[in-house]
């Protein structure tokens, strides 16, 4: 009986995927790729132009942006590269 109960608990944990965390890229502009673990369920990539040229910011979540700033949000690991 204990074995059956333990088996059910393990199967439940595996099926629910408890503890899953999303990973998003967080490098800026043309820097080498870096990844961070996120509590949010999405990643973002913001783009805008300034006197240096096109700027890119990546991270976790899906923030609000000002007019003139491009925003792409996505929901799979490292989808914002």
From Swiss-Prot:
Q: Name one GO molecular function term.
A: toxin activity
User: Which tissues is this chain's protein expressed in?
Assistant: Expressed by the venom gland.
Q: Which Gene3D superfamilies match?
A: CD59 (2.10.60.10)
Q: Which domain of life is it from?
A: Eukaryota
GO cellular component: a single term? extracellular region
Keywords, A to Z, come to: Acetylcholine receptor inhibiting toxin, Disulfide bond, Ion channel impairing toxin, Neurotoxin, Postsynaptic neurotoxin, Secreted, Signal, Toxin
Cysteine disulfide links: 24-43, 38-60, 62-73, 74-79
Which Pfam families has this protein been placed in? Answer: Toxin_cobra-type (PF21947)
> Membrane-crossing residues?
none
Q: So which residues are the signal peptide here?
A: 1-21
Which subcellular locations apply to this protein? Answer: Secreted
Question: What InterPro entries does the annotation carry?
Answer: Snake_3FTx, Snake_toxin-like_sf, Snake_toxin_con_site, Toxin_cobra-type
Member of which family?
Belongs to the three-finger toxin family. Short-chain subfamily. Type I alpha-neurotoxin sub-subfamily.
- Role noted for this protein: Binds to muscle nicotinic acetylcholine receptor (nAChR) and inhibit acetylcholine from binding to the receptor, thereby impairing neuromuscular transmission.
Q: Output this protein's name.
A: Short neurotoxin 2
State the species of origin: Cryptophis nigrescens
Lineage in the entry? Eukaryota, Metazoa, Chordata, Craniata, Vertebrata
